[in-house]
Amino acid sequence: AIDAAKAYNEALLSNAGRFTPTEEELNTYKSLLNADSTGMMGYIEIPEIRCELAIYHTVEESVLQVGIGHLEGSSLPVGGSGTHCVLSGHRGLPSAQLFTKLDRLKKGDIFTLHVYGQVLTYEVDQIAIVEPEDYGLLQIEEGQDLCTLFTCTPYGITVSYTHLRAH
């Protein structure tokens, strides 16, 4: 499963339209890191805000109501040089905390992804507020293993997004 995910990530490097996948590409994506057919691929642990949440395929609303979504078209969360995994979560839901406290993180804070027995630890190195359609900070950077967490800002409404990038 990890090898197939790494091959998928390598193919993303040459796919300029990766954030708008075709139906076939989306079906392939959803089949990877999907051991139990629920779409759950692992979980994220953020000690600083006492957060441990399941990570699921896609950023569809049904996913974001219950957990953290993996942005299709971004690298799958298996690490490696030339990867950039992007994870999204809601803030301000009455039914769940999710990424409500994400704005409390600062540069140097650590979070960990647990995926198929792998443990990937990242350190926040950049915090930015961006417009909803701005994918500039989500690009893959040669030689880097990156993960960005993002959520809506200000609290409870989506005017823009807070991006926390980590390496």
Annotate each language-model stretch with its function.
Residues 50, 91, 128-131, 153-156:
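A generic structural motif
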Residues 23-40, 66-74, 88-102, 134-136, ...:
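N-terminal post-signal-peptidase region of extra-cytosolic proteins
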Residues 1-41:
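Extracytoplasmic entry segments of secretory-pathway proteins
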Residues 35-38, 47, 77-80, 105, ...:
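Extracellular/periplasmic catalytic domains that process cell-envelope and extracellular macromolecules
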Residues 162-167:
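Conserved small/polar residues in nucleotide/adenosyl-binding loops
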Residues 123-135:
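Short, compositionally biased
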Residues 51-122:
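Mid-length scaffold segments of soluble, non-membrane domains
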